[in-house]
Structure formats: structure tokens, C-alpha cells
Amino acid sequence: MTYQAPDENGFYGKFGGRFVPETLMKAVKELDEAYRASKTDPAFQKELNYYLKEYVGRETPLYFAEQLTAHAGGAKIYLKREDLNHTGAHKINNTIGQALLARQMGKQKVVAETGAGQHGVATATVAALFNMECTIFMGEEDVKRQSLNVFRMELLGAKVVSVKAGSRTLKDAVNEALRFWVANVEDTHYIMGSVLGPHPFPEIVRDYQSVIGIEARKQHLEKEGKLPDAIVACVGGGSNAMGLFYPFVDDVSVQMHGVEAAGHGLETEFHAATISKGEIGILHGAMMDVLQDENGQILEAFSISAGLDYPGIGPEHSFFRDLGRAAYHSVTDDEAVEAFQLLCRTEGIIPALESSHAISYAVKLASQMRPEESMVVCLSGRGDKDVNQLKERLEGQTND
């Protein structure tokens, strides 16, 4: 069977859809039409491919992590090096596409939310490239955690708005960015940073991120003469994971593993494991698994990694879980920090804390597999942004 989702109403099974105020319905439909048209427009696709190659630096390598593999003592571990993209993460694959789309719709201003700051930097980058006005909403907590990325965005000409509402993290930044979009919808495009939000956003972001899996599939076939036995990626909203997974969805021999943030542990209140612990609800314009209390109030998500502490998850991930097509696991802060250090020492690669969650699970999984088997892990971003946070954490532990 060939996988086909979403349906014409933007649903992935019971997840997804389009739950937006009337003021946004026109903009969302306009976006949908522009996106469909762009897919069959050779000039648009040519320009997109030009920027991905010449500006972003694609394709990214599929690197055999020989020492990490030896450490795990099982399957071969390949790293899809999204950390080598311009701006240091997978986020720019999507922002380039959406900025071109905004330009096609005649919109000269863009707005975005950001958690770790990576999507904010990638949005500010393309706004500078295409000479667009850019506003970024970021939770006050994240502004503190990621002050370097705030400065980067400002250097690139963006206005960064610190959000003081609620938990002052990603969820609240999305709320404010959506409000801003409602008020400025005529001349502003919302560059959604993950496979979230009302239809067609999850589909658009998935398709722009699919370059990850398309390349990885081809590269692995060239290196090993077969498809990988497993693919692994971290999941917050889930765009790097969906970008890796989607091109493999019909290859049923390939196991797909998403890794959520377990924070201090699933038995505590301090985690961001939405697919393990969430229940169905509506958040930011779509039906999805959401961390909520018995009254349906959205709970605060928690993770050492600012890019994973979102209380929802992309609707297509929940659909994959229901179909049994992908399995979802979780990794604690401590395990992620351990994996961060392990990759530094074995391969000389400093990964983002987000990606470290995937590395942690991948090492565990590889050790249970045979040496003739192989896996691809999405190294979604580099860890420069996290070094300071990690330094403080490790120094704190030695002082205790």
C-alpha cells in the first residue's frame, strides 16, 4: 500500500485538521493554494534547489560513525549531518522554502516562533537574504537560556519579542506569534517552525524537511547497497524526524524510531514526552496529542533542551504511532548529556542537546542489533548553542 496523508481536510487519521479563527481561514487557504501551485512550478522548484545547494550547502554528508559504532558494539551507525547546514541545523531547509512561498504570495514580512532559537535564526537568516521584515517571538525563559541566538537574530536584522506569558517557553511564543499573524495577516506570512499548526503547515514543513530522508535513502543505498534497518531522530514538534521518516514510509523493512525528551523522568511532572504521556486535544490550530491535566489544561513541558520542550507533537507522528509505522521512545536529560559527551569524545562532533536524545537511544538500539545491520541517525543540529548551558550543569555537578 502506498501511504497517502493528509486527506483533503488536512487530517492524518483523527489528527491534524484546521482549527483557526475566521480571520485566519483566508490566509491559511491562500497558503494552501500557493503551496499546491509551487509544487508543480518548475521555476519555483529550480530556485528552491538553487538556494538549498548554493546557500544552505546541501547535500549534507551521511557519515559512518566508526568509533561510536565500536562503542555500541552492534549495528553500523550512520549520522545524517544536518548540523553542517548553514545556520547549524535542519531548520533552514524549511525556512528557505517558506520564505520563497511568502515572496510568491507578495508578502514582505515574516513572523515566527522559536524555542532553542535555531528556527528563529534560520528565519532571520532567510529574511535577511530575501530582504524581508522579520519578527520573532521567544519565551522569556528561552531568551535567557539561548542569549547567544537572540543576539544572532538581532545581528541578522530581526526584532526579537520576549514573551512573558504562561510558562514563558515555546508554547507561549507560538500563541503570541499566532496573535501577531492574525493582526497583520494581509502583508505577513507565518513561518511555522515544525510539523505543527493548522493544515497545510504540517504538510508544508514535512515536505521541505523531506530532503533529509530523500538524501539519506540515496546515500545509504550507495554506501551499503541496501536500505538501513532502522532510522532514528529526536522529536519535539517533530520536523527533523518527519523529514527523515517520510521518504521511508513505504519501505516497511525500515524501522522508524522517534525519541522524545523524558526530562527528569516520565514518572515526574518534568518531561516533554507528549506521545508517551499526552492525550488528544486541540493545540495551535490542530488536533494532536497534548500534555494536559484532568481538566484539559495544557501542562508545561520540560526538557534540558529548549527545542524539545513543546507540550504537543506533530499530528502525523501520532498517526504513525497509531498505524504502528513508527515507535516512540524517551530519553532523560542525564542520558542526553551523557550522549552529548560520548559523541564529542568518540567522533569529535559536538551535537545539539536535541540531537543528543537521538544519539542516546541509537546507541542503545545499535547494541541490540547485529553488526551486519545498519541505522541512520539524524544529527539535527550542532551543539555550539548548548556548550555554555552544559558547562554550567557539569560544573554544578562537580561542586555539589
UniProtKB/Swiss-Prot annotation:
SUPFAM superfamilies linked to this entry: Tryptophan synthase beta subunit-like PLP-dependent enzymes
Quaternary structure and partners: Tetramer of two alpha and two beta chains.
Source organism of the structure: Listeria monocytogenes serotype 4a (strain HCC23)
Gene: trpB
A single Gene Ontology CC term: cytoplasm
Protein purpose: The beta subunit is responsible for the synthesis of L-tryptophan from indole and L-serine.
Pathway: Amino-acid biosynthesis; L-tryptophan biosynthesis; L-tryptophan from chorismate: step 5/5
PROSITE patterns: TRP_SYNTHASE_BETA (PS00168)
Enzyme class label: lyase
Classification via Pfam families: PALP
GO MF annotations in UniProt: tryptophan synthase activity
UniProt-recorded name of the protein: Tryptophan synthase beta chain
Record family assignment: Belongs to the TrpB family.
Modified residues (N6-(pyridoxal phosphate)lysine): 91
Cofactor: pyridoxal 5'-phosphate
Reaction equations catalysed: (1S,2R)-1-C-(indol-3-yl)glycerol 3-phosphate + L-serine = D-glyceraldehyde 3-phosphate + L-tryptophan + H2O
InterPro entries: Trp_synth_b_CS, Trp_synth_beta, Trp_synth_beta/beta-like, TrpB-like_PALP, TrpB-like_PALP_sf
The EC number(s) this enzyme carries: 4.2.1.20
Top-level lineage group: Bacteria
Keyword Nucleus listed: no
Annotated keywords: Amino-acid biosynthesis, Aromatic amino acid biosynthesis, Lyase, Pyridoxal phosphate, Tryptophan biosynthesis
